[in-house]
Structure formats: C-alpha cells, structure tokens
A protein has these predicted regions:
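Substrate/cofactor-recognition hotspot
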Residues: 109-113
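Mid-chain, well-packed structural core segment of small domains
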Residues: 64-67, 72-97
C-alpha cells in the first residue's frame, strides 16, 4: 500500500501535468489552501494521488470526464480550473465544447449554457 508521501508525490505529478505554471506556486497564492491545508493535502492524496493515477483511463480522459461532471453539477469555479488543466492534458477545445453538448442532453441546457460561459472565458471565442 502506498504511503501518504507516495500519494502526495503522485498527486503532485498529476497536478503538475494539469497546471504546470502553479505547481510550485506559494500557498499564499491560493487562499483556500492556506485556510485549510489539511483538506488540500487530503485532496492531493486521494483525488490526484489515488484516483487520477489509476490505470485504464489516461489523464486526458479523466480530465474530460471531470470537466463534464463539474459542468453538469454547476461547479463553475472548479470547472474554470479544470478546463485549463484539460487543455494542458491534451484535450482539445473542440472536445471540451462537444462535452458540453453531452452535458446539455443529460444535465439540462441551463447547466451546459452556464458551463459554456465559463468555457468562453477560458478557451476564448475565436
């Protein structure tokens, strides 16, 4: 079984793929992480260290799935970050837009429209 340090390192590796520019950013840049460091350590170990590193789905696929779920749930702040991460993981702009079409069918047009507003900011409209 991996140790906490192993999971942290694996999680940091995934986060580095998704958000390379913020990998070594000071904690103060992220007020929520400064407020609740144990929570973000937990997320790094479990979400990124355990789940994102599992076999059978590539990081790019997990990223596309995550964007779709965040869009469907209306979690726009997290969606904004994960859209940028998806691009870094190799998901194309067109794939992200197509995923929002899928969201519209299964989670409703309002959920997809809200997500597309966020996507327009992240991806641009050109």
């Amino acid at each position: 079984m991996p140790t906490d340090d192993d999971l942290r390192a694996a999680g940091k590796g995934v986060q580095g793929q998704l958000w390379p520019a913020t990998l070594n950013a000071p904690t103060g840049q992220f007020p929520a992480a400064k407020l609740a460091p144990d929570f973000f350590d937990y997320v790094q170990q479990t979400a990124f260290g355990m789940i994102w590193t599992r076999p059978n789905l590539a990081t790019r696929d997990r990223s596309l799935i995550t964007c779709s779920m965040l869009a469907a749930l209306g979690h726009h702040d997290e969606l904004r970050a994960h859209l940028a991460g998806a691009l870094n993981a190799g998901v194309t702009r067109e794939e992200l837009i197509e995923a929002m079409m899928q969201v519209a069918v299964y989670a409703g047009v309002p959920a997809a429209v809200g997500a597309l507003r966020v996507a327009a900011d992240v991806l641009g409209t050109d």
